[in-house]
Amino acid sequence: MRCLTCLKLSFKPLCPNCLNDLPLSLKVRVLEGVSVYSFYAYSEIEELIKSKYALIGSRILPLLSQKAGKEFVRILQEKGLNIPLYGIAIDDKIKSFYSHSAALLKGFCQGNLKPTYGRLRANNAVSYAGKSLEFRANNPRDFTFRGDESLDYFLLDDIITTGTTLKEALKYLKTLNTKVHFAIALCSADE
């Protein structure tokens, strides 16, 4: 196999050098009173994040999320947040042979972060990719939660643009009295 970036021989779709060269740029936004952390600028990983639409994304996305997860676990440990936190990937339905959000969650969860799958599903399967804020507001996801409401959670999504999806998920989980400590987006498109 060859690295998709530099074309050198590699056991993974991104060689260690190219993965290390991708800069982490931690950003924090607050939505619904919850901190949302993003780790890459969309412009830096645009071609890689678009791999989510193809099967190769199942190999690329975990590499990106493992790198970000390693850094984030270090930050959590510095802040003394060592309790088990359970990750919820937003709408981790299988499309094109795998779930890109579940692949991200699996890669991100390290240390005290534990993945849970199939917990938060959208009843409205509309795609927000390239759509306006008005379209997003008029077509809510209408989430359903199938998890233990007594656990401590964090949310994960691939890209944060307007924050519409995360806001809706956070509002919905708040109505269920489900404790969400923070949310994570692999990259931020609000550059």
Feature roles, as predicted:
Residues 3-6, 15-18:
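Short cysteine-rich clusters marking metal-coordination/redox-active sites
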